[in-house]
Amino acid sequence: QDTYLNAKKYIEFYLVVDNGMFXKYSXXFTV
């Protein structure tokens, strides 16, 4: 299922961001 794979990718990306990488990119991105 492509939808499941896409969701998994998105979730994994979100987890990486939530792991602290967000602080590294927060300077580049405005949230």
From Swiss-Prot:
Cofactor binding description: Binds 1 zinc ion per subunit.
Subcellular compartments: Secreted
Domain of life the protein comes from: Eukaryota
Modified residues (Pyrrolidone carboxylic acid): 1
E.C. number(s) listed in UniProt: 3.4.24.-
GO cellular component: extracellular region
Family: Belongs to the venom metalloproteinase (M12B) family. P-III subfamily. P-IIIa sub-subfamily.
Complex formation: Monomer.
Protein name: Zinc metalloproteinase alsophinase
Source organism of the structure: Borikenophis portoricensis
